Amino acid sequence: MASSYRPMMAGVLALIAFGIGIALYGYQQAIYPVDSALGYLSRAESAQTPEELANFVKAAKREMPESGNPVWSFPTAKTDYALIQRNLDDIVARANSISSLEPYSTEYNTGLYDIHASLENIQEDLVDATPYLYVSFTNILLSAVWIAVILALFAIMRKGRAKFRQEYENQ
């Protein structure tokens, strides 16, 4: 029994390590880029100059996927990455046009306020899409692999226990 205990514990530890690895990989691939983009958009919303705002929006664009929709079950335009990317391009263009205006003028302040409101809407859309990122095709596939490994480990343990009982009864 003691000789089979070590491989069983090694299998359990390997299973735990595999599960942690899958969780980290899934987060890094599906969730972190959008979370990082949300951080840049938040900084852009609080930016006080159009140049600063445009730089943060460009950084957010680089982090976000260029196309696709995380809500793959019932996709909407609200969470379509291509449309969000287009909105961010428009925001950069508006920020560049505002930068030529006189600071603290009515036009300048109105333009910045409009951009900040647009950024807030985009952030809300991305936050609404975030739960669906956890249910991406990749994450479902990796979870299925992890469950298959757990079931295989239990089958091996049951087979080992049956073999141990048979040896014990034969003594």
Each language-model region and where it sits:
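Membrane-proximal, non-transmembrane alpha-helical segments
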Residues: D89-A148, F154-N170
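Short, Lys/Arg-enriched, disordered terminal segments
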Residues: M1-Y5, Q166-Q171
